Amino acid sequence: MAERRVTVGWPEGLHARPAAVFVRAATASGVPVTVARPDGEPVNAASMLSVLGLGVEGGQEVVLASAADDADIALDRLAKLVSEGLDELPGAV
């Protein structure tokens, strides 16, 4: 399973708008991705309610993971989005 540990770059954490940006990007990745606190259970990264339920604050670490064969590119892009607190997925049209 491919995995990336990243620090959340959005000051407000994975709440409201940043969570929506992240969920859209996870859905658009085309691979099943999970997100979790380092010591917590993973949740579906494409589920807004699940992501909000994590209660992740800015500056906290999360673990992105996927067992898909082609997960590395998707995880790298999502990790960049989360760590840099971007408003959209890098390379999005």
Model-derived segments and spans:
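C-terminal structural segments of small proteins and small subunits
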Residues: 57-93
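Short acidic, gly/pro-rich beta-turn/loop elements at beta-sheet edges
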Residues: 16-18, 74
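Hydrophobic alpha-helical context, especially transmembrane and signal-peptide helices
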Residues: 4, 44-46, 76
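Short amphipathic
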Residues: 1-10
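Predominant activation on well-ordered alpha-helical scaffold segments within soluble catalytic domains
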Residues: 20-23, 79
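Amphipathic, hydrophobic secondary-structure cores in small proteins
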Residues: 14-16, 23-24, 29, 34-69
